[in-house]
Amino acid sequence: MAALSFSGIASGIDTQAIIDSTVASARLARVTPNKTKLGELEETNTALETLGTKLDALRTTLQQFTSLAGGGVSKIGSSSKESVVGATATNAATNGSYDITVTSLAKNHTYSFDQTYASTTSPLESSLTGAEPAADRTVTFTIGTGANQETVSVVVTDGSYSISKFVADFNTAATKAEASIVNVGTESSPSYKVVISGTYEGTEKGTISRTALGASLASLTLFSESAASNSSLSISGIGNITRSTNSISDVIPGVTLNLASAGSATVKIAEDAATTTAKMQDFVAAYNDIVKFVSENNQITRDDSGDEVKSVFSPLATSRTDDSALQALRAQLSSSVASGGSRIRVFADIGITTERDGTIKFDSAKLQQALSSEPGSVSNLVKSFADNVAVTGGVVDRYTRYSGLLDISINNNKTLINDLNRRVSETEKQIQRMADSLKERYARLEGLMSRLQQQQNSLAGALGGGSGGS
């Protein structure tokens, strides 16, 4: 049915204005409060999601101090001769000094056909017709040994099969070696060779051997190679070591040795005060970011700018989830203790103290003093806190994981939001029905008023006519 529209001509009343005012009043009383609540809930959810992001950032900074990372103090490896051997250390490394003699380096295997070619598009074996048996046109390589072994076979199709095609087909089939074309001539007079290089050092994965050569590939019979070899070194107090790589991380716990050349050097492992301090500063910054965010979004302010004094709630003012998360972090910070420490037992002993606003203050000089006197106690203290906060099942995980405490709060709010949206929609329909009903009632009133006016005019005319005739 088309919407009724009228202007109160018969009654002289602006009925549309009355209807509009009635509708606006109904919306103000029944819709606006729900829409205001909707906005508040959506802001709360946005703030809770942001809190989750900040908690994850805190967890990332603390994961560097967990038991899984090796403890709460960073370590550094140094070498008396980096040109022979370098060293990197994880937090789990034990302080010490190691005399190392490198006898030989691990290297990969290289293999090349002795045949040279004038162009990268030159045929690999120009004498082929393609009618030969496939086995006579196939070259096969075995790469690696034992469980790490793979076999790569390339079938040369005919005399037009180029060296570039061979390289492409080999590289498609191989995972432990790579073929390439190398110019062993000059720029003006190039001379190309096909070279196959192992991608792994050492004999276990890096050995390359040509295990089959088709009878029709006579030009590929001759070859040159440089065999793969293992690294060899000796470490004082440990003995002789042979490995298939020049990066060795399974001899000294927490330490990776990077071999560079034959020779002797001394490697030392010690606390890395600078890195530990920098990581601690990152933790303090992430922790304080959470404290400030919760404080800023937990305010209830007074608004007396209008006719009535109103309380204005910040996004987290009606949520308890943020408060409980912050309380859990503070509880862990205050309860963490270094087991076995004499002078270093709590966070205040390493320069971390709590300010009146709930943020923490960091004295880096005090941390470095603690590292000099009791590095083990520092590590145990920080590790204990990090394990309780940053690992799976820890404080942060309980809030940020799927279906964790933040998810529960957000989903509860989403349920309320959906319910309020339904209420608003239904209320809008009710108000529209009320408006339509008012329009119909006023339309009937206008019709009645119009008919009464017509009757009045007719009666007045009749009375006026009768008077004139007498």
Predicted features along the sequence, with ranges:
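Structured, hydrophobic secondary-structure cores that serve as assembly/anchoring elements
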Residues: 295-298, 302, 432-449, 453-463
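Bacterial flagellar/type III secretion structural subunits and associated motility module proteins
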Residues: 1-39, 52, 60-294, 315-430, ...
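Acidic/charged coordination and interface sites in well-structured regions
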Residues: 57
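Short, glycine/acidic-rich hinge or "gate" loops at secondary-structure transitions
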Residues: 184-187, 298-309
